[in-house]
Amino acid sequence: MSGVEAEVIRTERLVLVPQRVEHAREMADVLSDPALHTFIGGAPATADELRSRYARMAAGPADPAESWCNWVIRLREGEENPGQGPLTGTVQATISPAVPGESGPGSWLVAEIAWVVGSAFQGRGIASEAARGLVGWLVRHPVRDIAAHVHPGHAASGAVARAAGLEPTDEWHDGEVRWVRRGAR
């Protein structure tokens, strides 16, 4: 395992909370709009399907060199109840060694990130703020290079990637453009 585990991340308006199986019911409602699947495919998951998915995620990857870090995005509701607002979406990072099989001094980690915000919460900068918070958290850990894959027709996700400090490359994967943030070497 890369040794990196999800921790609470706070931003100005959000709290990114490590995802738990118990979040599935509320997240099924948040992610229930079929329009969310326009670029990623599939259909909205039921609460039971999300519970199963979240349980698999919590179990971790088969590759012990990888870490799966998953968060739900919660709105902060005032200073008296920070972190008590509604869930609005998710962010995730798959973290692995930059060179497979290498760890220890001189090695570094890379991360593939993704995000989704429920339709009812879009257009408020939530995805951009969450992605910036995630990238900031990753670079405070030994993660040097960060990448995301964005459908070329999804301008909003491109804007989120750019806001998080990623830049588009000429690389494509499964019909999506690879965006990267390269750290210092």
Question: Language-model segments: which ranges?
Answer:
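GNAT-family acyltransferases
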Residues: 1-120, 132-137, 141, 145, ...
